[in-house]
């Protein structure tokens, strides 16, 4: 009968995602790049997920996202995808 019920050498993907970025088995960042599509003109803008400034559309100037001190908060009509 094992004393520990959790395998420390082979953690599950769910437990790795919950762990702090420096305490994971292989340290990985929490940030990523986004492609945001403007709902007004359809242009795509590439930005960082933790941007510190307001993101505006490059063509029409409509605001696409607001900084929150952490992750970027997108406007409700914007569609996005994570770049890999």
From Swiss-Prot:
Cofactor note: Binds 1 zinc ion per subunit.
PROSITE patterns according to UniProt: RIBOSOMAL_S27E (PS01168)
Cofactors that this protein relies on: Zn(2+)
GO biological process, alphabetically ordered: ribosomal small subunit assembly; translation
Gene3D superfamilies: Zn-binding ribosomal proteins
GO molecular function, one term: structural constituent of ribosome
InterPro entries tied to this protein: Ribosomal_eS27 (IPR000592), Ribosomal_eS27_Zn-bd_dom_sf (IPR023407), Ribosomal_zn-bd (IPR011332)
ZnF (C4-type) intervals: 38-60
Pfam families in alphabetical order: Ribosomal_S27e (PF01667)
Cellular localization per UniProt: Cytoplasm
Zinc recorded as keyword: yes
SUPFAM superfamilies: Zn-binding ribosomal proteins
Entry GO terms, CC: cytosolic small ribosomal subunit
Keywords: Cytoplasm, Metal-binding, Ribonucleoprotein, Ribosomal protein, Zinc, Zinc-finger
UniProt key word Zinc-finger: yes
Assembly information from the UniProt record: Component of the small ribosomal subunit.
Purpose of the protein: Component of the small ribosomal subunit. The ribosome is a large ribonucleoprotein complex responsible for the synthesis of proteins in the cell. Required for proper rRNA processing and maturation of 18S rRNAs.
Family: Belongs to the eukaryotic ribosomal protein eS27 family.
HAMAP family documented for this protein: Ribosomal_eS27
The protein, known as: Small ribosomal subunit protein eS27
Organism: Entamoeba histolytica (strain ATCC 30459 / HM-1:IMSS / ABRM)
